[in-house]
């Protein structure tokens, strides 16, 4: 079952895009990652009716765990562990080609090792290894 009605979903999505627009972020690509990456067939259908496509990050890459903090116990993943996962995945036969990476813009204050502080170094190294970073529209065409 769903936790939201179609009307509340449509209203919420429209308000979120309106707020992003007010802040100067244009979402002309029509892709979005649903809150908590939670969605099902109905959400996909409703999104498509609005002209949007829900997407998700690529599994296996644990960057989305950058929101976690030590008090979460087994669900916590340190920035060292997240980064090691990136380098491990990059060494696989297809590497990180085509990966959609989710990194949170902000995290809980209880997380002291902010993964986003490492992004510049990681991106620079991946570029040296030949990776290119592309817009989601280019990736999914």
Listing of model-derived features with the role each one plays in the protein:
Residues 1-102, 106-127, 131-132, 138-141:
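Catalytic domains of cell-wall/extracellular-matrix polysaccharide-remodeling enzymes
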């Amino acid at each position: 079952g769903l936790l939201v009605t179609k009307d509340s979903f449509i209203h919420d999505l429209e308000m979120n895009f309106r707020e992003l627009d007010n802040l100067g972020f244009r979402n002309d690509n029509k892709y979005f990652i649903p809150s908590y990456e939670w969605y099902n067939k109905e959400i996909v259908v409703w999104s498509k009716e609005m002209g949007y496509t829900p997407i998700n990050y690529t599994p296996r890459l644990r960057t989305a765990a950058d929101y976690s903090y030590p008090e979460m116990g087994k669900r916590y993943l340190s920035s060292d562990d997240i980064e090691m996962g990136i380098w491990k995945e990059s060494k696989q036969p297809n590497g990180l080609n085509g990966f959609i990476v989710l990194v949170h813009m902000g995290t809980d204050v209880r997380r002291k090792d902010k993964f986003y502080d490492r992004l510049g170094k990681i991106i620079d190294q991946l570029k040296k290894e030949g990776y290119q970073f592309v817009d989601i529209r280019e990736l999914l065409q």
